[in-house]
A protein has these predicted regions:
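Transmembrane-helix motifs of polytopic, lipid-linked glycan transferases
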Residues: 76-100, 135-139
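Short hydrophobic/aromatic helix or loop-helix immediately within or flanking a transmembrane segment
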Residues: 46-80
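Extracytoplasmic catalytic/substrate-binding loops of multi-pass membrane glycan-assembly enzymes
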Residues: 23-39, 46-58, 164
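Start-transfer (signal-anchor) and selected internal transmembrane alpha helices
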Residues: 1-22, 97-101
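Membrane-interface alpha helices of multi-pass inner-membrane proteins
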Residues: 148-169
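Membrane-interface transmembrane helices that cradle and orient dolichyl/undecaprenyl
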Residues: 133-149
Length: 169
């Protein structure tokens, strides 16, 4: 099977279009006060310890620290997570040699286009799992010492678990 490198110019445009349309849809999604993905980020520890309350506590802290609205804090957190995810994914994939099936999988609506194709998936906490995974791959690929990779995993994995509890199931 022939392996090919992705055309960087096309891939750059593709990632940029995914990024811009995701930001556009995420911003417009926040205009509706009944969106449940916003309330998912509001769960906090004020009513007692819950496994997924750290995200809400971080948003409340950002609201008080920067004197912004809670909706703006949630939108900012979601945008930062999504932008970091796409940037790290771009740097991880751009130099890989892929076969035709992997290229089709990469450009399918089930991978990079999924948050755009299914707006309910845009801005959800599951993106933290993907971001954590791609960060771990990034550290492993860049030939960091195993102690640094292990420290990254042991520090950030519990934080991700306290934000999104399904990861521990």
């Amino acid at each position: 099977m022939v392996l090919a490198k992705i055309n960087n110019k096309f891939f750059n445009y593709y990632i940029f279009i995914c990024l811009v349309t995701s930001i556009f849809f995420l911003y417009h999604k926040f205009q509706f006060p009944t969106d449940w993905t916003t309330s998912e980020w509001l769960i906090n520890y004020q009513g007692g310890f819950t496994r997924r309350g750290l995200g809400g506590e971080i948003n409340i802290f950002l609201t008080k620290f920067f004197a912004i609205s809670l909706r703006d804090a949630i939108l900012t957190i979601q945008l930062v997570i999504f932008i970091l995810y796409l940037i790290l994914l771009f740097f991880y994939i751009k130099d890989l040699k892929l076969n035709i099936f992997q290229i089709f999988a990469l450009f399918s609506p089930l991978f990079l286009l999924y948050p755009i194709a299914e707006l309910e998936a845009l801005g959800r906490k599951e993106l933290l799992i993907f971001l954590f995974y791609i960060c771990t791959l990034f550290f492993c690929e860049k030939k960091f010492k195993p102690i640094i990779v292990n420290l990254f995993i042991f520090i950030f994995f519990p934080i991700v678990c306290l934000i999104w509890e399904q990861i521990i199931l």
